[in-house]
């Protein structure tokens, strides 16, 4: 029996296109201006120092701009990049330049689960900070109260079984009582290996996999 739901964001409850076509280009467009303005701030210095450790060299502002810009183009799942993007997106969401779209069927179903007392968690490669911004400034307003918790790559890669085992521990349930929904077959495979129930969300632009149960809308879910 499913006692908790774990959800991916992009391609599952929000269009893939928003992140790729709106959020990523926004973070790249604002990158230089943001770093120039905030280069001396402790939280930004800390992010740059993490990158310097990865690169094994010190970075000038110009080099940091070039490197982050390249990583955005390559869609690299690197924690300091995600944290920096989180800061940039924060400005965008708070100014009203960015508003997070959600599939209506997903929003309605998450509300229904909340009313039934079924906890819903998010696991995304975007930082927890970015997730809070996303759900705090959605087209339906601030809906963070619909979720019981947020996980990002600090707990581990979404393609590793151990990440899902750790999440189950954090949630406080055995994996077989948690349902994970994602568009990504590799993530679903890792979650299944950890013992979770899994369903593939097949939205526009998503390639269906033959290995998993599928839905095209959250209205198909009966929990």
Curated annotation (Swiss-Prot):
For this protein, what does the record note about how its cofactor is bound?
Answer: Binds 1 Mg(2+) ion per subunit.
The cross-references to Pfam families, in alphabetical order and at most eight, read: Hydrolase
GO BP annotations of the record are: L-methionine salvage from methylthioadenosine
Kindly tell me the pathway this chain contributes to.
Answer: Amino-acid biosynthesis; L-methionine biosynthesis via salvage pathway; L-methionine from S-methyl-5-thio-alpha-D-ribose 1-phosphate: step 3/6; Amino-acid biosynthesis; L-methionine biosynthesis via salvage pathway; L-methionine from S-methyl-5-thio-alpha-D-ribose 1-phosphate: step 4/6
Q: List the catalytic activities from the record.
A: 5-methylsulfanyl-2,3-dioxopentyl phosphate + H2O = 1,2-dihydroxy-5-(methylsulfanyl)pent-1-en-3-one + phosphate
Q: Does the keyword Cell inner membrane apply?
A: no
Purpose of the protein: Bifunctional enzyme that catalyzes the enolization of 2,3-diketo-5-methylthiopentyl-1-phosphate (DK-MTP-1-P) into the intermediate 2-hydroxy-3-keto-5-methylthiopentenyl-1-phosphate (HK-MTPenyl-1-P), which is then dephosphorylated to form the acireductone 1,2-dihydroxy-3-keto-5-methylthiopentene (DHK-MTPene).
Q: Family, per the entry?
A: Belongs to the HAD-like hydrolase superfamily. MasA/MtnC family.
Report what the protein is called. Answer: Enolase-phosphatase E1
In which organism is this protein found? Aquifex aeolicus (strain VF5)
